[in-house]
From Swiss-Prot:
<keyword id="KW-0234">DNA repair</keyword>
<dbReference type="InterPro" id="IPR034137">
    <property type="entry name" value="TOPRIM_RecR"/>
</dbReference>
<dbReference type="InterPro" id="IPR000093">
    <property type="entry name" value="DNA_Rcmb_RecR"/>
</dbReference>
<dbReference type="InterPro" id="IPR006171">
    <property type="entry name" value="TOPRIM_dom"/>
</dbReference>
<feature type="zinc finger region" description="C4-type">
    <location>
        <begin position="61"/>
        <end position="76"/>
    </location>
</feature>
<protein>
    <recommendedName>
        <fullName>Recombination protein RecR</fullName>
    </recommendedName>
</protein>
<keyword id="KW-0862">Zinc</keyword>
<dbReference type="GO" id="GO:0006281">
    <property type="term" value="P:DNA repair"/>
</dbReference>
<dbReference type="Pfam" id="PF21176">
    <property type="entry name" value="RecR_HhH"/>
</dbReference>
<dbReference type="InterPro" id="IPR023627">
    <property type="entry name" value="Rcmb_RecR"/>
</dbReference>
<keyword id="KW-0227">DNA damage</keyword>
<keyword id="KW-0479">Metal-binding</keyword>
<dbReference type="Pfam" id="PF21175">
    <property type="entry name" value="RecR_C"/>
</dbReference>
<dbReference type="GO" id="GO:0003677">
    <property type="term" value="F:DNA binding"/>
</dbReference>
<keyword id="KW-0233">DNA recombination</keyword>
<dbReference type="GO" id="GO:0006310">
    <property type="term" value="P:DNA recombination"/>
</dbReference>
<dbReference type="GO" id="GO:0008270">
    <property type="term" value="F:zinc ion binding"/>
</dbReference>
Length: 204
C-alpha cells in the first residue's frame, strides 16, 4: 500500500489540519481554509493565536478534571456549592449544559470520555481511578452522599453509568441516574435546558 505523503505547502497543511475537527471532511476543510484566506485573514490570525494560547495554557482541574487554566477550576472553588453532591458527566460540554439548567448545585467530575472497548476506551482512559479518589477522599473533607450519573443515553453512556454504579454500590453511597426525559441515544450537549433540568430533578 502506497504511503500517503503529508502536504508540503502551507495551504495543504492548513486544510489537513482543519480535518481534525469533528464532522469536517476534505471539502469542508478546503472551504474553511479558502474562506479564511480570501475573506478574513485577520480572523484567521486571531484564531491561530487563540488556539495556540489555549493549547499552552488550558489544562485539567485537579479536582473535577474539566478544562481549566488554573489548578482548581472556578466551579470547584465556589464555596456556595454543595460538596456532598457529585454529578458525573462525559465531557466539559455536558457539564456546561447541566450548569445552564440552574438546577444542580453540587460539584462535578468530568470523565473526558465513556467506556467503549471497541474504541480502546476502558476505565483507565476515562480517569476512573481519579473519580474513585474524588469520591473516597473528597478535597473538601465533606463526605459525598449522592453521586448523580449524567452520562449520555447512548449504549456507551449507559454502560459507563452501569459500571460506575456497580463499583459504587458496595460503598454505601447513594447513586442516582438522570431521568429518561432525554431520548434514547440522545447526548446532553444537544438537549434543551428545560428537558435536562427535569431529567435532573426526576433522577432516581
Amino acid at each position: 500500500m502506497a504511503r500517503i505523503e503529508a502536504p508540503q505547502d502551507a495551504l495543504g497543511r492548513l486544510i489537513e489540519a482543519l480535518r481534525v475537527l469533528p464532522g469536517v471532511g476534505p471539502k469542508s476543510a478546503q472551504r474553511m481554509a479558502f474562506y479564511l484566506l480570501q475573506h478574513d485573514r485577520n480572523g484567521a490570525a486571531v484564531l491561530a493565536q487563540s488556539l495556540g494560547e489555549a493549547v499552552e495554557t488550558v489544562g485539567h482541574c485537579a479536582c473535577c478534571n474539566t478544562f481549566s487554566e488554573t489548578q482548581v477550576c472556578s466551579t470547584c472553588s465556589d464555596e456556595r456549592r454543595d460538596p456532598s453532591l457529585l454529578c458525573i458527566v462525559e465531557t466539559p460540554a455536558d457539564q456546561v449544559m447541566v450548569e445552564q439548567t440552574l438546577s444542580f448545585k453540587g460539584n462535578y467530575f468530568v470523565l473526558m470520555g465513556r467506556l467503549s472497548p471497541l474504541d480502546g476506551m476502558g476505565p483507565n482512559e476515562i480517569s476512573f481511578d481519579r473519580l474513585l479518589n474524588r469520591i473516597e477522599t473528597p478535597d473538601t473533607g465533606v463526605p459525598i452522599r449522592e453521586v448523580v450519573l449524567a452520562t449520555n443515553f447512548t449504549s456507551e453512556g449507559e454502560a459507563t453509568a452501569h459500571y460506575i454504579g456497580e463499583v459504587l454500590k458496595p460503598k454505601g453511597i447513594k447513586v442516582t441516574r438522570i431521568a429518561r426525559g432525554i431520548p434514547v441515544g440522545g447526548e446532553l450537549e444537544y438537549v434543551d435546558a428545560g428537558t435536562l433540568a427535569r431529567a435532573l430533578m426526576d433522577r432516581r
